Amino acid sequence: MDSFAAAETWTDAAGGAGADGRNLSAALAAGAAAEALGTEWLQLLVQAGNLSSSLPSSVPGLPTTSPAPSQPRANLTNQFVQPSWRIALWSLAYGVVVAVAVFGNLIVIWIILAHKRMRTVTNYFLVNLAFSDASMAAFNTLVNFIYALHSEWYFGANYCRFQNFFPITAVFASIYSMTAIAVDRYMAIIDPLKPRLSATATKIVIGSIWILAFLLALPQCLYSKTKVMPGRTLCYVQWPEGPKQHFIYHIIVIILVYCFPLLIMGITYTIVGITLWGGEIPGDTCDKYHEQLKAKRKVVKMMIIVVVTFAICWLPYHIYFILTAIYQQLNRWKYIQQVYLASFWLAMSSTMYNPIIYCCLNKRFRAGFKRAFRWCPFIQVSSYDELELKTTRFHPTRQSSLYTVTRMESMTVVFDPSDADNTRSSRKKRATPGDPNFNGCSRRNSKSASTTSSFISSPYTSMEEYS
């Protein structure tokens, strides 16, 4: 996560110095500085300082320094210098990511916090996810892209520390917010009789996620440095024990912010999916049961798509880092710069997809986006959209520490005392939770001429949580 462009800049300096035979000391100095960087580009940097004057600088991405006047014209060619049209296309691509991610996630935050109906446990974690994604897009994506294009750090020493520190923090907060949602869905569906997280407990979990994220990213902040070179300023991370320590740290980061949480979410959503889509529950089912089951499926389906999107977007970036660290000759490949820009763009684009997914798969978020863009002549907000965020479809009542949705049916019973024995023997046994025919809808027959069907959703939970 630390500065890719800084390593490339050192490569550029080393290659330019090596190309000028009169400045061997500068080449050695550049190579030593590159070694201090401790990035995955270390071997390339050392090699660049010892290249012959006939080999151009193998920098995967940035404009190079001007060669010495005495350098032969044939040596000026650099395969990594991009044409203007390509820079314009990359700028447009990164600009779209920043715009959609920032404004889309801010609207998601507004939809949840401004409407009481949307303030559920799951949605509080979605607020945290949206905040971390919007922050990543606003404070990291564009700055890193500018640095990669210009090979110069314009933003000062303090922002250099922030730039190397915050991306890991934001990604950690994002993926563990998704993990918390997965665990919450698991508890609500697999063990619904246990109390759900309260608003206070949810805030504590969110705070704990950010504290752990800060601790994981702290070394990046402590070891960040800026260095003023002739004509440019660099931002990089200098690890005390060199590149090996850097590589180990990033492997740990990949495990903690990618492999481990995806494993947890894969297990939980697999179990939840088998439960929700495994087959029809035997016995008669009431309408409310079917409706709540359908709502639960929609929420789980949406979150699975969010997780899969995140995994796909970040996988090429992690593969790129590991391969270029192990097989350093890849850094000389003609198209390595484009591969990096594409993998980094795909990773950063993960911040913009979630608002689109929410809008497409959840009618309340869709109604909220319509309200946010009601000023647009192509967007029409219906009365249904207005009511969707303001009213509740069900009015749960608190009974024995449980929220229930109850449907009452009345019937008339003619009772003949002479048939009492036959009535007792033919009376249907009431289904219980241990009965395989029990499906959440209980039916009670009695002499009092009333039949009650009730569905117990989960403790402290209403249908609002799943709609």
Curated annotation (Swiss-Prot):
Cysteine pairings via disulfide bonds: 160-235
GO process terms (BP): positive regulation of flagellated sperm motility
Annotated membrane topology: Multi-pass membrane protein
Cytoplasmic side: 110-119, 184-203, 273-301, 362-467
Gene3D superfamilies assigned: Rhodopsin 7-helix transmembrane proteins (1.20.1070.10)
GO CC, alphabetical: plasma membrane; sperm midpiece
Glycosylation sites: 23, 50, 75
Region feature (Disordered): 416-467
Compartments, record wording: Cell membrane
Stretches of the chain found on the membrane's Extracellular side: 1-86, 142-161, 225-247, 324-336
A Pfam match: 7tm_1
Biological role: This is a receptor for the tachykinin neuropeptide neuromedin-K (neurokinin B). It is associated with G proteins that activate a phosphatidylinositol-calcium second messenger system.
Protein name, as recorded: Neuromedin-K receptor
Biological classification of the source: Eukaryota, Metazoa, Chordata, Craniata, Vertebrata
